[in-house]
Amino acid sequence: MKITCLNLAGYKNWSNRESLIIKYLDKVQSNIVFFQEVKYNPDISILNQAQLINSKLSDSYQYSQSAISRTYITSDGKESREGLSVLSKYPIIESEILVLKKRNDDHHTRIIQNVDILVGGQLQKFTNVHFSNNSYSDEQLEEVLSLIKERNQKRIIVGDFNIADINSVSHLFSERYISSFSQSKYISFPSEAATFDHILIPSEYKFTSFSLGENLSDHNALTFEI
């Protein structure tokens, strides 16, 4: 099973990046794609950004789910809407959006996207995340891990964790999960030479391949096989 994860960074420099993203996805041919910072801007398209990308792929994904639920005012005074999306070659059986706890001084409400996908006759559970870009990201990871444990679920957690040093929080997950960074040291946010994007797989799984997609966004795409 091949999976790609990419923070789209909305429509920034979209005229230069759109074709690169489409070309990359056509090349890697992942079974499932997870996006963060997916915009919906009706001035650009009646489709949200993930749907727009999917419509232009040479082999589009049959199944998709999006949660465009976050609104905020940009620096130029315009309303912006964004969220999380998944594209899948396999049937999406169930999806769920959960709002994470919000600290009073945190500017944005964060959500997670749980999707259950039928892969080869077996139900595989995923959680797509985009945590706060501040110290609360550690707490949000702990909240997600606790929720999954309390539900007695096995999930692959993927997305923009906004945690630069994943080893500093490894005590939260190391007994149950393997991190992508422990398998391959990589940079996912080149402008700061940082690694904010991660994949956590249950410890009984293993990564069989891992690669980066560069110059698609301010984040690099992560593509991995398990």
Language-model features and meaning:
Residues 1-32, 45, 63-66, 71-226:
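Active-site regions of metal-assisted phosphoester/phosphodiester hydrolases
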Residues 36-43:
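Active-site neighborhood of divalent metal-dependent phosphoester/pyrophosphate hydrolases
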Residues 48:
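Glycine-rich loop at the start of a catalytic domain that most often binds anionic cofactors/ligands
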Residues 54-61, 87:
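Charged, glycine-enriched surface loops/patches
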